[in-house]
Design a protein with these regions (language model features):
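Alpha-helical solenoid repeat architecture
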Residues: 1-6, 24, 36-48, 67-71, ...
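Bulky hydrophobic/aromatic packing residues
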Residues: 5, 48, 54, 147-148
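Disulfide-stabilized cysteine-rich extracellular repeat microdomains
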Residues: 18-19, 27, 31, 61-62, ...
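Buried hydrophobic core positions in alpha-solenoid tandem helical repeats
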Residues: 21-24, 64-69, 100-104, 142-144
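Alpha-solenoid helical repeat architecture
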Residues: 26-30, 69-73, 105-109, 147
Length: 179
């Protein structure tokens, strides 16, 4: 709760090893309202800065929040799923540790991919090494495989990412191109 008010208080929660118990509650707690409180708390920690978000990403919190958000119909309350989605959005929008976001490119539905691709579009232009790593890891190819509706925010983000790579590279990694 205190993480919501100030970035230094959120960092104090991180330094005092508060992420692990919150993540554990998110995964193992049988009561949805406690899971929802844990999701909300994790989102409050991650919303302050890229450093805060990196700690959460390194602890695999985004993947856990995504798993909760994507629970099957009838599992998990609407409140839990809503809080998980909001926490995931808060963390993604601050996360500049792109390698931690790459697994979400495979697992996330399009509404979450919109936030993930927006982060890549924001961070990749300033980081040449990240662009190379993005290609080598398969993340760039995965971006090309996303089925995004024309005119959607997701499509805009993908186009923004592609604009920072040579056209031949984009074509090479696009589906249907023989290698």
């Amino acid at each position: 709760y205190i993480s919501a008010f100030d970035d230094s208080l959120a960092m104090a929660v991180i330094v005092s090893k508060g992420i692990s118990p919150l993540k554990d509650a998110l995964i193992h707690e049988p009561e949805d309202h406690i899971k929802a409180a844990a999701a909300w708390s994790l989102g409050q920690i991650g919303r302050h800065s890229p450093d805060h978000a990196k700690y959460l990403a390194e602890a695999d919190v985004p993947a856990r929040l995504l798993a909760v958000y994507m629970m099957q119909e009838g599992q998990g309350s609407t409140d839990l799923k809503d809080k998980s989605k909001k926490a995931l959005k808060n963390i993604i929008q601050m996360c500049t540790h792109l390698s931690s976001l790459e697994p979400l490119l495979i697992l996330a539905p399009n509404n979450i991919l919109t936030y993930v691709t927006a982060q890549f579009a924001k961070v990749l232009p300033q980081n040449t090494e990240a662009k190379k790593t993005f290609i080598k890891s398969g993340g760039f190819q995965r971006i090309q495989e996303i089925d995004a509706a024309p005119g959607s925010k997701l499509r805009e983000n993908i186009d923004a990412i592609n604009s920072h790579f040579p056209v031949k590279v984009v074509q090479y990694y696009s589906p249907g191109v023989a290698t």
